[in-house]
């Protein structure tokens, strides 16, 4: 408040560990700044805010620990939830808390911030944070990474990395940081990146390791609007159950992903995994038949059960590399187009119900397969009256 009263500026916290057990509001025009000028890891130490704050009587719906008013920012700081897995809570059942950081107006920014461990990361969905800027976030949020919506326009999410090893690779001697191994939990409980009602959003060069949904598009809980047109460049989801999930989309939704790396790993308690999931069930009314997802120059690898599950809408793949495709591009509803792509998984016999590089289900409308290469030859299976067509179908 003193910095605000002086006309705004920077409140600098030198390297060290600070205990903060009550929410902090950073006023408009003020930056809360720590010792780091670059992205950093838990094991590097520096300026850190430790907390036991869990929302108090209102729990996870309580106020965020760090609240950024319009034009405020936080930079160069580590955050750590000390009691995430203590006092009756464990790595298998961690404590639920509010988001650690919340933007409460336009032009908020979060730069070079690391969440050593926390339940939820950054809330940019509860308010209109148009012009928000997030750059070089790292850490291991357990249930939510960055959630964006609220009608925000012209925001940037760039160069972030979420990975469970932030919770287990600590500075020399530990220095009071909680040591937690959260891989299995985040793979079954975390939604790392959520985008709802946003416009002209820049989503660039981000990486998520370990999550149910690596990047997730859905209807906005505040405005009731759907994702619009947006472009995602250089996104990576690794170790995920569903690397990219479109849960809600209307007729104007068009999501274009360029140079994506979408990876599944074999997760014992997640029996169904796919690189892409379009809609949560066959012919879901949450995804409009004309909603579009377009992927250019994608790398798919790992241990999928299905290469893609398409329940509604229109999904297009151009120049995709399916190192492994599982049971193929499974069009259960809606339409798919696959162009100039490479299916590298070898198959030992002719396609049956669960084999092949492409499947068209009983309620699937169509799949176009054109100019693709299949290492074991063109294999597909079809049920119902939908259409399989394209230059690959002789």
Task: Give names to the regions the model predicted.
Residues 8-17, 35-47, 72, 77, ...:
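Extracellular beta-strand-rich, repetitive "passenger/adhesive" scaffolds
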Residues 2-10, 361-367, 382-384, 391:
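Beta-strand repeat architectures
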Residues 36, 78, 83, 114, ...:
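A structural signal for beta-strand register positions
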């Amino acid at each position: 408040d003193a910095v605000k009263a002086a006309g705004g500026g920077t409140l600098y916290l030198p390297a060290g560990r600070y205990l903060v057990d009550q929410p902090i509001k950073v006023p408009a025009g003020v930056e809360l700044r720590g010792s780091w000028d670059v992205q950093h890891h838990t094991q590097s130490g520096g300026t850190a805010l430790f907390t036991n704050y869990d929302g108090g009587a209102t729990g996870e719906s309580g106020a965020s620990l760090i609240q950024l008013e319009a034009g405020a920012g936080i930079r160069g700081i580590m955050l750590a939830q000390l009691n995430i897995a203590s006092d009756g809570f464990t790595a298998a059942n961690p404590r639920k808390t509010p988001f650690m950081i919340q933007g409460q107006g336009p032009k908020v920014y979060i730069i070079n911030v690391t969440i050593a461990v926390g339940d939820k990361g950054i809330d940019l969905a509860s308010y209109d944070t148009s012009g928000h800027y997030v750059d070089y976030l790292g850490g291991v949020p357990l249930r939510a990474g960055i959630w964006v919506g609220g009608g925000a326009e012209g925001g940037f999410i760039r160069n972030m990395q979420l990975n469970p090893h932030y919770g287990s690779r600590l500075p020399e001697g530990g220095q009071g940081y909680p040591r937690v191994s959260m891989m299995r939990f985040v793979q079954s409980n975390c939604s790392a990146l959520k985008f709802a009602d946003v416009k002209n959003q820049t989503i660039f060069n981000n990486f998520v390791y370990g999550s149910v949904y690596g990047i997730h598009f859905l209807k906005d809980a505040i405005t009731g609007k759907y994702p619009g047109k947006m472009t995602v460049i250089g996104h990576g989801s690794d170790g995920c159950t569903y690397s990219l999930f479109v849960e809600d989309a209307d007729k104007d939704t068009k999501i274009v992903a360029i140079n994506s790396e979408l990876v599944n790993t074999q997760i014992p308690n997640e029996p169904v995994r796919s690189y892409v999931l379009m809609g949560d069930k066959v012919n879901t009314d949450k995804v409009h038949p004309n909603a579009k997802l377009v992927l250019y120059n994608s790398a798919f690898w790992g241990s999928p059960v299905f290469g893609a599950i398409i329940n509604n809408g229109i999904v297009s793949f151009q120049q995709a590399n399916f190192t492994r495709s599982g049971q193929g591009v499974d069009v259960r509803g809606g339409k798919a187009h696959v162009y100039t792509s490479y299916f590298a998984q070898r198959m030992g016999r002719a396609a049956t119900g669960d084999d092949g590089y492409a499947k068209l289900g009983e309620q699937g409308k169509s799949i176009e397969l054109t100019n693709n290469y299949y290492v074991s030859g063109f294999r597909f299976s079809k049920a119902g009256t939908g259409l399989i067509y394209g230059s690959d179908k002789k």
